[in-house]
């Protein structure tokens, strides 16, 4: 379906109706030009089904990961503590998935308070995820490249680091909590997005560029640096066991980037276009709007993928899961002995003990 948009009022109504849940901001600049807008978007029922599956898989998988790590208290490593917090963040976000699913179908019917809270949870999940992965990369870099027991081996320091990550993630996410509002224009579904008032372009630049610089780009550079030197050390020293055990961490980082990097790149392109750093055309505007919808779904999918990684390539996770079942009498000791896979302990390899 195509709609001729000839003034700001019509455009505003169309955007709220068709892109109610897109994170991209509606164009409100004075020089906004009329466009022939293509409103064909992803099938909302398919999106609802995807969100429902993500909710179920994430709820089950991340709860299981937390149980396995909490049960293996005696041999819990520093990386396990970080991954425990990562599972907590994904589980917290998963609890909001039913709300996102309903909003795709009916618009935002939950009011402004829940609009603020759910948006805050989404951003906290994103920032805490990449900051925790950056901390893991630093820990592995110091432990393998410099072959030393880092200060983070002290359990109480790890807890303070995790608390600091949660606090920083909350600070970086506060703009979404402060500025998100629900609007219900006539003949249109209610929407939840930032109300920036005047000077929209300036505030959009601040709210997008600064948090993503400190909460995404810088942690990403830290990860690339640390894992680059870590991989070089592993290959040069022929540390076979450490290399195999590091597969889980590398897989977690790779999946995070595959899920969230496309969304952030599209969001950056949208910001540059809306602030006139790059030329804005009707075709480019429509392409970016569609890309925001698609890549946001990919980002949401991330919350259920880490447990799948642990189950398929995390030897110690499978061992910990079987051990937990045996302790509860759900499987026999003989079954545990026969099916338990060989693991690499953190004492000999200095890698995650439970995953």
UniProtKB/Swiss-Prot annotation:
GO terms for biological process: calcium-mediated signaling; immune response; neutrophil chemotaxis; positive regulation of cytosolic calcium ion concentration; receptor internalization. Residues 68-73, 139-159, 233-247, 314-355 are cytoplasmic. Residues 1-40, 93-114, 185-204, 271-290 are extracellular. Keywords: Cell membrane, Chemotaxis, Disulfide bond, G-protein coupled receptor, Glycoprotein, Membrane, Receptor, Transducer, Transmembrane, Transmembrane helix. Glycans are attached at residues 7, 21. The keyword Disulfide bond applies. It is a multi-pass membrane protein. Disulfide bonds join 115-192. The keyword Disulfide bond applies. It comes from the Eukaryota. GO terms for cellular component: external side of plasma membrane. The chain crosses the membrane at residues 41-67, 74-92, 115-138, 160-184, 205-232, 248-270, 291-313. It is found in: Cell membrane. Neutrophils. GO terms for molecular function: C-C chemokine binding; C-C chemokine receptor activity; interleukin-8 binding; interleukin-8 receptor activity. Its main location: membrane. Receptor to interleukin-8, which is a powerful neutrophils chemotactic factor. Binding of IL-8 to the receptor causes activation of neutrophils. This response is mediated via a G-protein that activates a phosphatidylinositol-calcium second messenger system. Belongs to the G-protein coupled receptor 1 family. PANTHER family: C-X-C CHEMOKINE RECEPTOR TYPE 1 (PTHR10489:SF916), CELL ADHESION MOLECULE (PTHR10489). Interacts with IL8. Interacts with GNAI2. This is C-X-C chemokine receptor type 1. It comes from Oryctolagus cuniculus (Rabbit).
